[in-house]
Amino acid sequence: MGKRLLDKLWERHVVTTNENGLDLLYIDLHLVHEVTSPQAFEGLRLTNRTVRRPDLTFATMDHNIPTKDVWNITDRIAKQQLDMLRENCKQFQVPLADIGDEEQGIVHVIGPELGLTQPGKTIVCGDSHTATHGAFGALAFGIGTSEVEHVLATQTLWQRKPKAMGIELKGKLQKGVYAKDIILHLLSKYGVAVGTGYVMEFYGETIGTMEMEERMTLCNMAIEGGAKAGIIAPDEKTFAYVKGRKYAPRDYETFEKKWFELYTDADAIYDLHISIDVTDLAPYVTWGTNPSMGVRIDEKLPEKHDVNDERAFSYMGLIPGQSTYDIPVQHVFIGSCTNSRLSDLEIAASVVKGRKVKEGVRALVVPGSKRVRDAAMQKGLHHIFEEAGFEWREPGCSMCLGMNPDQVPEGEHCASTSNRNFEGRQGKGARTHLVSPAMAAAAALYGHFVDIRKESYDGAISYS
């Protein structure tokens, strides 16, 4: 019987197996940020240990930093965590993309753009959306703080091998429908626990048509379905993306030959298989308090089915059967490790070019990294957004989570390109609606949700 992509990635990294069936995996890349690392570094100090492989470790500042005035850090805990990361990286000789550094940005944005993320690697980070890197054919997953310490000290991690889920995507997406809509559809149909105990492998003709940044969006939110990770077999698009980046292998051709072996064999069998035809898929909007509570833009909100629905409707200030078009939007956030890359900003800019943000709506665009910011500004995207009434910010996690100054006021609704809509995720009492960059941009113009498929934009920005 053939092997799945998961099998090939896993087997290449097993150091040993213990009596309980746990495998000790070698970790090829450890990404670090300021929130989940302080206790881990302190653990090294208390036990007089060093970081085993600083050269396989890379840190950045992203969660806590302000995006309006990056140096004006007024929150005491945030400043303490940022200062500690700077001190820890200096002491343990870990490379750091500090505030203001040209490589700084959201950890799951800078990994791929710097070429740190590569096919065949095992990648971990103290952040649940580490699955993003699986778009490159890497086995990438989030870990807890105690595990962060273990990897820092040993460059290994004890893990139980998950099962493999194959998610086949067939058909061609309509104009105005994106990878974000695919994953929101998957979650709305199968729920937030469908992937528990599995690694999701996305494959099929639809994947072949997707660019790398769309694939990253898919894998980024695999965790929202309960999966350990999301992976996609590397192909020519993957190799072209990695080639020439700062940390890409110098002996690139040798690595590329090995990467060509990373695919699921034709006779391999998944433990669970799901097939989705995306041809008639529509833009999605979440209405509730987890990512599975979503509907097509052309559907009405569902009826209450259980106490969770009742609580969600109450928290969100919505009613069953309400039209998605009637959901008010006071805030728009285009950013996060899900949708803050250059192509995301280009799509949003193509929607708002020459138009104005609705009076009373606050709209933010937060590039995922300094490099994304600079590339967007070279193309004049910041002028398009600012002329439309958006705020153009510095890189960071920003309004994705309520850990920095960018928050949504209590009781107000935000169209967000992020990945989670839990109660209080964007601030106390904030009401979050997950959408694609195109849908978020359109909501900023109208002050409510609209069907982006009916808007007169071409999905690609013209710089004339």
Curated annotation (Swiss-Prot):
Cofactor(s) recorded in Swiss-Prot or TrEMBL: [4Fe-4S] cluster
Catalytic activity: (2R,3S)-3-isopropylmalate = (2S)-2-isopropylmalate
Cofactor remark from the record: Binds 1 [4Fe-4S] cluster per subunit.
Keyword Lipoprotein: no
Catalytic activity, EC: 4.2.1.33
InterPro entries: 3-IsopropMal_deHydase_lsu, Acnase/IPM_dHydase_lsu_aba_1/3, Acoase/IPM_deHydtase_lsu_aba, Aconitase_4Fe-4S_BS, Aconitase_4Fe-4S_dom, IPM_dehydratase_rel_enz, IPMI_cat
UniProt KW keywords: 4Fe-4S, Amino-acid biosynthesis, Branched-chain amino acid biosynthesis, Iron, Iron-sulfur, Leucine biosynthesis, Lyase, Metal-binding
GO molecular function, one term: metal ion binding
Record PROSITE patterns: ACONITASE_1, ACONITASE_2
Recorded superkingdom: Bacteria
GO BP, one annotated term: L-leucine biosynthetic process
Binding site for [4Fe-4S] cluster: C337, C397, C400
CDD domains with a match to the protein in the record: IPMI
Job of this protein: Catalyzes the isomerization between 2-isopropylmalate and 3-isopropylmalate, via the formation of 2-isopropylmaleate.
HAMAP family: LeuC_type1
Family named by the database record: Belongs to the aconitase/IPM isomerase family. LeuC type 1 subfamily.
PANTHER family: 3-ISOPROPYLMALATE DEHYDRATASE (PTHR43822:SF9), HOMOACONITASE, MITOCHONDRIAL-RELATED (PTHR43822)
Quaternary assembly: Heterodimer of LeuC and LeuD.
UniProt name for this protein: 3-isopropylmalate dehydratase large subunit
Source organism of this protein record: Bacillus cereus (strain AH820)
